[in-house]
Amino acid sequence: MRSLSKNIWIMSNFEVLLTTLTGDRDAGGCRYWNGSFEEPLSPGETATYQFYADASHPNSKYVINDNKVIFKEPEQFGGDYRMFTIIDTELGRSEQDGRYIIATCEPAWYELDDDFIENKRPTDKTPQEALDLLLEGTRYEGEVDPDLQMRASDSFYQVSVKEAVIQFFQTWGGYFKDTIEFDGNEITRRVIKSLKRRGAANGVRFEHDKDITSIRRNITGYPKTALYPYGASLEMTDEDGNATGGYTRYIDIKDVVWSKAAGDPVDKPAGQAWIGDPDLLKVFGRPMPDGSLRHRWTRWQNEDITTPEELIEAAYYDLINNVSKAIVNYNVEVAPKNVKLGDTCIILDREFATPIELEADVIKMTYFTDRPEEGATIELGEYLNLDDIERQIGAINDRFKKNEGKWNTGGGITEVTDGAFPDKKPPKPSNITVKSMFQSIFLSWNYDPSSYIAGYRVYASKTPGFTPTDNDIIFEGKMSGYEHKVGNNETWYYRLSTVNYHKTESDMSDQYSAQSERIMNDDILFGAITADKLANLAVTADKISRSFDEGNIFPGSLLKPSQFYDYPNTKHSVTDKTFNELTITQVIDDSTRLRFGISGQNKAPNNIQRMPLEQGQIYTLSFEVKRNNTTDLSYIHLKKPDNTFMLLSSSLKDISAYPSDEFVRVDLQFTAPETSSKFTLGFGGYNRNGNVTPCSFVIRKVQVRKGTEIKDYGYSPYDIMLVDGAIYSDYIQSAAINSAHIADAAIGSAAIQNAAIKNAHLGTAIVDTANIKDAAITSAKIKELSADLITSGTINAINITGSLIRGGRFEPLNESSAYTSYIEGDKIYQRVNTINYGGTPKKTYNDLTITSGGVTMVYGGRDTGTDEPLREMTLRDGSLYMSGNKNDTGYSEIQMYCNDDDVVNAPKSIFRQKLGGVNRMSLHSYYNSVPGSYNVQMDTRNTSIYSHFANGWQLTADGKIMIMSKNGQGIYLDPSNDNVAGQVTMHVGNAGQAGGLIQPVIAGAPHYSITDIHGALQTNMSVMLYQYNFVMPSKGDAYASKYNDIPPPFECENIFMVVPTVFGGYSDHVHATITSQSSSGFRCYVRGTGSSTGILGRTFQVRFLIFYEVN
């Protein structure tokens, strides 16, 4: 009866059963093999499943990406259904398996990576309650072992559910396993299990030469024998217990005294800042010249510990149980046994110089689902050395008896939970800085190491003066900085707080703000006015457009000091920067005036009181303000020569929440009170400190735009383009523009487009007869023109339409001496002279001649005054000729032609390359009438250059193949002479050896008894001789051994056989064997024969004869 545990089920992405693949070789249907399942004990490591399937079977079409794969674990490995998702497929072919498809899969529970948790904070929850909360809304449900009831708390903020599940096991413990329930047709349940443990301590033993196929020990880390412990940094207080704002150094154990006589584990005198263990010193200490042993120290810290007595207890416990332990993992291949992931096993291999005798957990397991009876490869970790068990148990018993009374009463050590810390209101974050960056804003603050502080919160909003809520939290954690990812040119406002372990929050910090930066360039900065737009006569009608509806319509956006005037008790100044900053300062005199401010100038020559507004239209005023000590900025208004209109700016009556030393963007919408082009803006505020101290503020980036859309700042076209009043005395010095700057005819027709100069720009009778010269009125100005009006002269710039134009020579009208072109008879000719600038100028020309017989193109130089052809191409008589400069030695030529039209000679096509007029390579394709066959010949007799084929050369013939040099040496292939069908003899040389013996170049074929193990030969078999040195152990007996895993010294597809030979002194006292081999290398053992201990410490040279398949 077929085992269902060897089947795998394929379901669609929508989980419809598509087909079943079988792992039984003799069963019908679509077969799969090498179903390798690797599962780690930790959910943080990725489980993988990969299998091969028969690609020639029609049902293999279902093995595609995103489809699901289900298999049932063999009972000895758990018996649960497991589900995976296909993430990659690869097609292949081999002689052994034919066409196949390889599918690589990842665990199906990884779909939880697509589910997102914004903010979940299970507090004081059991594992079942916490896991249910995390999986809420997903297709998975949690199942926790009833024995796991430890309550804990954790925060899951902006993470995927997959990440949250991994974090869950780190906080609440337990062992992870994902399973499904499957009835053979559909999935009825998906489960994330938290088990008390996986596997069991069932005493399974694996021994060398009995159960263990191979074993590797990996040791990392260095054990320490003593620690320098440090705890928390405590808040400093005065004599009354009030916090002074400072913190102590990290607490240490200098003042703690331990005495073994008093029941302590070890002796530790006062003044000693470290704690060590004498037993560890004896085992791991470093020997000194005087015979003493020196501790191996390291730093150890737990900032949650606030007393020296608790600190030394915790440090010593960690020293004994963790810090003094090396990290050891074992990779073991074992014969089939009833062992599962998580089992505690005993491994025995005493043939190592340092015998392996250990007890360890299975932390990773790999087996094949189609042949589980072959056993598994397991990886072991976190072991307990059996030689140390008795000593450690004794030490633990002694320590327990000595400290039983202390530990029964708690000994001053309690479980550290969130509730163990004082519920003290923490101070708000200090030294907060906010830095603008491109598409982000970085915040930093001082980190407070106090043990009772759980972390910090950052609140953010685009609204100034916002009240922080949980929805505004963008960061929560125990760090001293955070980068907030935002868009370009965005303004954000921030407030920060500190939180303790009881969720008690500090007072909020002041509000901070910043605007993310954008990349500035001249187009942004100067409105895309570049040098080519300011060239002579380059200002045309389309550049004097007056349609500024989409831009900043406020004249004065440059914030020039002369563009504004002061109200009473006010003065202003401008700081020149990338964006000018206008400072408005109150001047306090004997009056009680509180209001101060400025307005746009309305007097020539700096008049900016000319902003156009339409009654009823909504506009948006935007600017940035740094308030300094001003808290009321509500005196913002529109100004006309005869009237003032206050803007609704109640939000600016109290701006005390704005940072005093940072710019904050302000956006105000208003409706135009009337239609006029004489508006400007006024900016002002009120002194709210009783006129004790003068107030001031700074503005920049002022703009007014039509509509309600808030846009990035841009300069006003009224300030940077040529419009009425845009150029005034600030830009024009006395007599700076005079007649010398306006040359005759400098304003030509190109600069005066249709209607560009309107009546308003032309005075009465400004154009008179004196300005209309002879022939100044062209055909464009004449509506009709008949032939009788043309009696002589030249016809310029017109179109001639008709059926026939006759003439001996036609030339285009052009005004460039560098260009020549004409049509004459059967000839069309064009020539262009050019000059290349790039270092020394080089004069060149391009010449084209087209006749009825051919086309000639010439590229040449003319630096000497005489044309010198450099490259020439001619197409004539159906042939192509290309050459370099024929005046140069060794010039190059390429000729391509055919003579199919020649009835005398046989048809022939030729491709010829020449150097200096001599044939260097000819490729002929011709018909030979004598043998009656088509032939191709390559002739390179006049060259010593070899032929190079970068990616290979395939030569195929229906008959014989001969490759021969001039002296008769070469290779001759003649299938017709073979005695065995399908074989080809490769001959080397002309006559072979004496007696007519022909040596084969290479021959080799593995028997099926070999290919059934290693796979069939796909390419060539080759032989390699290789040498490797083996250094024998310096200690042991005459049976000592040494092995090496030797990677292949070449790329290979497979290794079929390795023959080792030991040579040199004492080589007759050892023998070499090969224990394993694959395409990745082989393992060789050199063992003593028991006849001599002279092999110890000796280096043996081992030579290998390797039969392999070329990759």
UniProtKB/Swiss-Prot annotation:
Q: Which UniProt keywords apply?
A: Host-virus interaction, Viral attachment to host cell, Viral attachment to host entry receptor, Viral genome ejection through host cell envelope, Viral long flexible tail ejection system, Viral penetration into host cytoplasm, Virion, Virus entry into host cell
The Gene Ontology biological process annotation of the record reads:
entry receptor-mediated virion attachment to host cell; symbiont genome ejection through host cell envelope, long flexible tail mechanism; virion attachment to host cell
Q: Where in the cell is it found?
A: Virion
Name the Pfam families for this protein: Prophage_tail (PF06605)
Annotated Gene Ontology cellular component terms: virus tail, fiber
Q: What is known of its domains?
A: The N-terminus is part of the distal tail cap. The C-terminus is part of the spike structure and is probably involved in host receptor binding.
- Function, in words: Binds to the host entry receptor YueB and triggers viral DNA ejection. Binding to Yueb. This interaction initiates a cascade of conformational changes at the gp21 C-terminus causing disassembly of the tail spike organization and opening of the cap region formed by the N-terminus of gp21.
- Protein's name according to its UniProt entry: Tail spike protein
What species is given as this protein's source? Bacillus phage SPP1
> Taxonomy-wise, where does this protein's organism fall, top ranks first?
Viruses, Duplodnaviria, Heunggongvirae, Uroviricota, Caudoviricetes
